[in-house]
Amino acid sequence: MSDPFVVRPRRGAPPEAVRRSGARASAAPREPARRRALPAHAAIDPLRALLSDPDVTDVFINGIDGLYADRGAGAERVAGWVLDGDRVRALAVDLIAVGGRHLDDATPLVDVRWEHGARVHAVLAPVACGGAAVSIRLPQVDLPDLDDLGRRGMFDASTGTRLEQLIADRANLLVTGSTGTGKTTLLAALLGRVPSAERIITIEDVAELRIHHPHHVRLEARQPNLEGAGGVSLARLVREALRMRPDRLIVGECRGEEVRELLTALNTGHDGGAGTVHASGIRDLPARLEALGALAGMDDHAVARQVVSAIGVVVHVGRGADGVRRVLGFARPVLQGGRLDVEELP
């Protein structure tokens, strides 16, 4: 039986390249990207051709309503994909099993990471009303550096220079944006500019940060088992990382009480740290941080004082109507009447 779809390379005009100081007006063509490495498990075979495509960043199965793929310009429906509800459910169960976890009616929402870095989230019916829903976030085949992101249109030359200076100055950074806007990609590229003599420790719920750096230690949280034992939280990992003599401490995404540990670390001499936070806009950030602080038992005034002291610059990213991820602005946290606010920077 043939695959239910055929993956064909998308060819189109490249984004306008950023002409950095001293760069030539034309660049040599980039070598074709490698195929993405995937687990050898047979459960992946129905999707293997699509998941192996280096241009694909995300794949979504919306129950019986179809299969979608994002190649960097928004999700598009994959033609020819037809599965009934039972087969979609079976596929979702199998995809989660590849990551070593169990998906069933008693545990209808599960998140796993495959070997080689793909992140898979699945929800079974009836929680997912239209049938089993699967979301697959794929690691990039080739790690883009800041120059690559500039060529792709994420920022112009002056913004690229500004970003590099923030790393050189050891500013504490918070990268914000909505889902799929390139927060992790930008942060990884920035960390690739850290001097090789410095020790970077990254802490993530699911390890996604891949960095071109010789001294990088990756820590990943662990969910508890069915008996509720064995879990290792992000907050615990932040505390442990402080004992590992980091030159730069990075929290991949602050989603809860770990924000307290990150702010404490950045307020005790660990300059050059960074994290990401989900926020739709720069002006939404204060409310988001207050909500995260509340999960850690911090009141709004404590959050405001800690954030203003710990975070030097906020870098906000978003996706334009054309689907291109861009740096949309810079800001710094400030106190306004004892409450947290942000001041946008020119």
Name each model-derived stretch.
Residues 1-105, 111-114:
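N-terminal accessory targeting/assembly segments
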Residues 70, 76-169:
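P-loop NTP-binding catalytic core
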Residues 28-41, 306-310, 321-346:
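NTP-binding/hydrolysis catalytic cores, primarily Walker-type P-loop NTPases
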Residues 141-151, 188, 192-239, 285-289:
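P-loop NTPase switch/communication element
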Residues 175:
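Hydrophobic anchor at the beta1->P-loop junction of P-loop NTPases
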Residues 79-80, 147-155, 216-234, 248-252, ...:
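Flexible beta-alpha connector loops of hexameric P-loop NTPases
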Residues 183:
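Conserved lysine of the Walker
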Residues 211, 241-316, 328-335:
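Conserved P-loop NTPase nucleotide-binding/switch module
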